[in-house]
């Protein structure tokens, strides 16, 4: 947060410089179909994909797939949306996985979770040029419109990762705000000096 913003959480004060080295990031959130490939490749059984704490969680929980997934009587995967079971839609963003599951998926996919600073850099660069000035939103500083992001559950659910192209960041990254929450590598801690 910067001092020009009206409301900020006290543990988000204040913007401070961080060195961000070059990195790569996916242009959309991970989808159900991408995560399903991990599940069907025995990602929950392959202990080499899990860090020690994640493996402890996995063994305690007994999970072999995401908690809100199940196979129907025809062997098709379903996901739970409140009280309803729906067939997996390939382009919906992956939801309801914990940090350990996200990290295991990333290792399987030969990726990693972005650091918070990397994610913020990718999501909030200036709308005019790449410099130290952060934009408020991925597309710049103009207030969000309904065509740019699924905010405040206005659609009543999650949306296809291909939706909201007008909300893309300068880097062509889609849905950097709204729709679902994202995991980063960092543990949630207040900024230095808080």
Per-range role (PLM):
Residues 1-13, 18, 28, 43-194:
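Functional-site microenvironments in short loops/helix caps that host divalent-cation chemistry
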Residues 31:
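Acidic-aromatic/histidine active-site loop/patch
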